[in-house]
C-alpha cells in the first residue's frame, strides 16, 4: 500500500483530494494552511481542504511554517511514500522533498513552463490566452521548476472568468492525476525537463492590479474584468469614490473620447471609452459600502447624478 500525504488548501485542491480517495489510494494525512479569520466577527474559517479531510476522517495538520523542523517532522511522522500537492500555499523544505520514495509531485494550473507561480488562472485570462492547462511535475526547491510528468490542455472560452476556468482546471487536474499516478508508481513514466528559456511567471495578485486602466484597449480591459471575477474583482473610481466593476462587455465605441469618459448611460449599462475603438459597457457594479447590483438599479438610485462626459478612474480614492 502506497502511503500518501496530500497537501492543499483552497477549493481548487478539493476535487484532486477526492479523486485520490475515490481511486482507492491511502491518504494517511492532509496538510493545509491554518484557519483564517473572516467576516465582521473575524471568526476562524477552515480551508476547504480541511473540511473535506475531516468529512472523510483523515488526520489534518495545519503548520504555520512548514519549513521549520518541528513542523515538517510532523509530516514525516506519517512516513509518506509520496507527497501530492495542489495549491498548498507554502514552499516545502528539502527534507520533505527528499523523504518520499516516489518523491513530491504537484498539480499546477498552467502549461508549464508558462505561468509559474500562485495566480496562473488569473494571468491566463488576463493575458488573453485561448488555452491553458494543467501540469503534474516533480517538486524542487525552485518555484514550479521541476521535471514534468504529464500535461493536458484546457481551452479558454471568451466568456470564461477566473471562477469558471478554475473549476475546469481543477477537474482536469483531478483526471490527469488519476491517469498519471499508476504510471508513476509502476515506473512507467519519463520525466521531461522544463525549458527555462520559455518560463513565464504569474505572481500572486496585488491590490494595485485590481484597478482598471482605461487607457488600455477595450479587449485588454474586458480580459482584466473577467480575470478578476469573482475574485478579487476589478475596480475604478468616479469623483473619488470606488466602484467595484463586477462585469462588463465589449461594445463598439459610439464616438471618440479620452479613455475613461462616460460615452453613454443606457438602461442596463454605462458605456466607457478605452484606449481604442472598443468601449466597455459596465453592466454590474458595487459602490463602496453598498451591495453588488445591476447597473440599471444603480442608475435609478445613487448613479442618477451621472452624466455623459464624466470621467472614470482619473481621481484619487476617497471611499
Swiss-Prot record:
- Asked whether the UniProt record includes Magnesium among its keywords, one would answer no
Under the heading InterPro entries, the entry gives:
Fmt, Formyl_trans_C, Formyl_trans_C_sf, Formyl_transf_N, Formyl_transf_N_sf, Formyl_transferase-like_C_sf, GART_AS, Met-tRNA-FMT_C
User: What sections of the protein cross the membrane?
Assistant: none
Its domain of life reads: Bacteria
Detail which positions bind (6S)-5,6,7,8-tetrahydrofolate.
110-113
Cystine residue pairs: none
* Enzyme Commission identifier(s): 2.1.2.9
SUPFAM superfamilies reported in the protein's UniProt record = FMT C-terminal domain-like (SSF50486), Formyltransferase (SSF53328)
Q: Where do the coiled-coil regions begin and end?
A: none
Spell out the reaction equation it catalyses.
L-methionyl-tRNA(fMet) + (6R)-10-formyltetrahydrofolate = N-formyl-L-methionyl-tRNA(fMet) + (6S)-5,6,7,8-tetrahydrofolate + H(+)
Gene Ontology cellular component annotations, sorted alphabetically: cytosol
- Output the Gene Ontology terms for molecular function: methionyl-tRNA formyltransferase activity
The answer, when asked if Protein biosynthesis is one of the entry's keywords, is yes
Keywords associated with the record: Protein biosynthesis, Transferase
Return the similarity comment. Answer: Belongs to the Fmt family.
What is the protein's known function? Answer: Attaches a formyl group to the free amino group of methionyl-tRNA(fMet). The formyl group appears to play a dual role in the initiator identity of N-formylmethionyl-tRNA by promoting its recognition by IF2 and preventing the misappropriation of this tRNA by the elongation apparatus.
Q: Which NCBIfam families match?
A: fmt
Q: What is this protein called?
A: Methionyl-tRNA formyltransferase
Taxonomy-wise, where does this protein's organism fall, top ranks first? Answer: Bacteria, Bacillati, Bacillota, Bacilli, Bacillales
Amino acid at each position: 500500500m502506497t502511503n500518501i500525504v496530500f497537501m492543499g488548501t483552497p477549493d481548487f485542491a478539493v476535487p484532486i483530494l477526492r479523486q485520490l480517495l475515490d481511486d482507492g489510494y491511502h491518504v494517511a494525512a492532509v496538510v493545509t494552511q491554518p484557519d483564517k479569520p473572516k467576516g465582521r466577527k473575524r471568526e476562524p474559517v477552515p480551508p476547504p481542504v480541511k473540511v473535506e479531510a475531516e468529512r472523510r476522517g483523515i488526520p489534518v495538520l495545519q503548520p504555520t511554517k512548514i519549513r521549520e523542523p518541528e513542523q515538517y517532522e510532523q509530516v514525516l511522522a506519517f512516513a509518506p511514500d509520496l507527497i501530492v500537492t495542489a495549491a498548498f500555499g507554502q514552499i516545502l523544505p528539502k527534507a520533505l522533498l527528499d523523504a518520499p520514495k516516489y518523491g513530491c509531485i504537484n498539480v499546477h494550473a498552467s502549461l508549464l513552463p508558462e505561468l509559474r507561480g500562485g495566480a496562473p488562472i488569473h494571468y491566463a485570462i488576463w493575458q488573453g490566452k485561448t488555452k491553458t492547462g494543467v501540469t503534474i511535475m516533480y517538486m524542487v526547491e525552485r518555484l514550479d521548476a521541476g521535471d514534468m510528468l504529464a500535461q493536458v490542455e484546457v481551452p479558454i472560452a471568451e466568456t470564461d472568468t477566473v471562477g469558471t476556468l478554475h473549476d475546469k482546471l481543477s477537474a482536469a487536474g483531478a483526471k490527469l492525476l488519476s491517469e498519471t499516478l499508476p504510471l508513476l508508481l509502476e515506473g512507467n513514466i519519463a520525466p521531461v525537463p522544463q525549458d527555462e528559456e520559455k518560463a513565464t511567471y504569474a505572481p500572486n495578485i496585488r491590490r494595485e492590479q485590481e484597478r482598471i486602466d482605461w487607457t488600455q484597449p477595450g479587449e485588454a480591459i474586458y480580459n482584466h474584468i473577467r480575470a478578476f471575477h469573482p475574485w478579487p474583482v476589478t475596480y475604478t473610481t468616479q469623483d473619488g469614490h470606488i466602484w467595484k466593476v463586477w462585469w462588463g462587455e465589449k461594445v463598439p465605441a459610439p464616438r471618440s473620447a479620452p479613455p475613461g469618459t462616460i460615452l453613454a448611460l443606457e438602461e442596463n449599462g454605462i458605456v466607457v471609452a478605452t484606449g481604442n475603438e472598443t468601449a466597455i459597457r459596465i453592466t454590474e457594479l458595487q459602490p463602496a459600502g453598498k451591495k453588488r447590483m445591476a447597473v440599471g438599479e444603480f442608475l435609478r438610485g445613487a448613479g442618477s447624478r451621472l452624466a455623459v462626459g464624466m470621467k472614470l478612474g482619473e481621481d484619487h480614492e476617497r471611499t
